[in-house]
């Protein structure tokens, strides 16, 4: 990885504050880092302007992405984002600005949808399947179901021609229903899907930090092999019916690896780094999964994003992924597609005795093995200048 050329920042204007109480949410635990968050949870205009100036200045490429997340980013209100767009236009310097926005959908209405459409926001909606699967975990703070409101949000976005995709957390419940989940997401109009494996461990005082190795999994975490089987079931439908029409992040990333293209998903890159998380007060961390004091890079009021991106701590964090890879990974036939996965998930014992083997290894191996024939065929099409989507005719 070429550190310092560009960086991505997942910015959280409301920190961990959210209007839901999802039973599996790892980010609610981060509120302990900011105990006064309930009184000071909104990013100031000063911090917003400084962030936008620095994010644009930190990029040595022509496209600048702003990724708004949470907590729940709608809680800060539309005027905040109108100001953000104003600052982006003021400081863009001819660069192309792209805004992405990840939401639980609860507050989405015609006003929000109109704003998103007006400014070409790409909106990600968190939804875990149909009502029975979604409402098992994603509930309000009073324990009420949320699926109906989320489905209404999707419908509202579609009516206003807002480009949206879906993010589905694969957990202990919906992992058993891959076909049901996939067909449901298709039915609501999702044309790009992300399937995120839920892997969380529980320490005595809450969720585990990365260095905590010998503690139990949470009961809502996905089973590794079952995650692979989930992906395989979805893949078998997708390649026969929907390739070329529906994008699935993990499938596209795997094909890119087979074709020798640069990884677009940090989980499967050889190194980490330059994919930061920023809290409402300007604190910047190495990664959204490593929002702990020891991984804090600094604050944008004292140090610029470019300085953090080019700094030694970021370089060290990035190269640590490669150095800490398990021995099994170096010998694995799927190393080119996986590179040991996310460091957050490396806590199982490896052959060397170190606790650095990825929890999801069995699932990834099942997926890579199952899809190898199709991936190889699509690579051949790609090398001939033919769209890999043409493989659909072979599998019909």
Predicted segments, located by residue:
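Extended hydrophobic secondary-structure segments that form protein cores and membrane-embedded regions
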Residues: 9-12, 65-71, 98-103, 248-250
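Radical SAM enzyme [4Fe-4S]-AdoMet core and its adjacent flexible, acidic
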Residues: 140-148, 155, 159-267, 271, ...
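Canonical Radical SAM [4Fe-4S] cluster-binding loop centered on the CxxxCxxC motif
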Residues: 3-46
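Flexible mid-to-C-terminal extensions adjoining Fe-S/redox cofactors in radical SAM and related proteins
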Residues: 291-396
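Short cysteine clusters
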Residues: 18, 22-25, 266, 272, ...
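Radical SAM/AdoMet-radical enzyme domain recognition
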Residues: 48, 52-53, 57-67, 76-208
């Amino acid at each position: 990885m070429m550190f310092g050329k560009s960086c991505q920042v997942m910015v959280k204007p409301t920190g961990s504050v959210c209007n839901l109480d999802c039973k599996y949410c790892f980010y609610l635990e981060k509120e302990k880092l900011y105990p006064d968050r309930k009184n000071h949870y909104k990013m100031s205009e000063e911090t917003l302007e400084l962030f936008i100036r620095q994010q644009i200045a930190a990029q040595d490429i022509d496209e600048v992405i702003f990724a708004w997340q949470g907590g729940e980013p709608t809680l800060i209100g539309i005027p905040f984002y109108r100001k953000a767009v104003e600052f982006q236009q003021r400081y863009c310097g001819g660069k192309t600005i792209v805004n992405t926005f990840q939401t639980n959908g609860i507050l989405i209405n015609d006003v929000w949808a109109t704003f998103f459409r007006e400014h070409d926001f790409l909106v990600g909606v968190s939804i875990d399947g149909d009502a029975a699967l979604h409402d098992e975990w994603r509930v309000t703070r009073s324990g009420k179901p949320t699926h109906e409101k989320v489905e209404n949000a999707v419908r509202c976005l579609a009516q206003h021609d807002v480009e949206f995709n879906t993010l589905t957390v694969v957990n202990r419940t919906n992992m058993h229903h891959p076909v049901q989940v996939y067909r449901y997401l298709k039915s609501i109009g999702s044309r790009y899907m992300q399937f995120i494996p839920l892997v969380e461990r529980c320490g005595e005082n809450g969720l585990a930090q990365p260095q905590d190795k010998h503690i139990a999994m949470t009961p809502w975490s996905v089973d590794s092999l079952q995650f692979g089987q989930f992906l395989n079931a979805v893949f078998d439908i997708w390649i026969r019916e929907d390739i070329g029409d529906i994008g699935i992040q993990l499938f596209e990333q795997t094909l890119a690896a087979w074709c020798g293209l640069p990884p677009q998903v940090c989980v499967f890159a050889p190194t980490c780094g330059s994919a930061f998380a920023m809290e409402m007060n300007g604190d910047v961390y190495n990664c959204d999964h490593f929002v702990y004091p020891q991984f804090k890079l600094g604050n944008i009021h004292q140090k610029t994003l470019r300085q953090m991106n080019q700094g030694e701590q970021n370089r060290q964090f990035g190269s640590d992924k490669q150095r800490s890879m398990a021995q099994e990974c170096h010998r694995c036939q799927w190393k080119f597609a996986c590179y040991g996965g996310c460091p957050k998930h490396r806590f199982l014992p490896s052959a060397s005795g170190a606790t650095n083997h990825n929890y999801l290894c069995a699932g990834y191996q099942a997926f890579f093995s199952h899809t190898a024939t199709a991936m190889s065929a699509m690579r051949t099409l790609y090398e001939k200048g033919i769209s890999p989507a043409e493989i659909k005719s072979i599998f019909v």
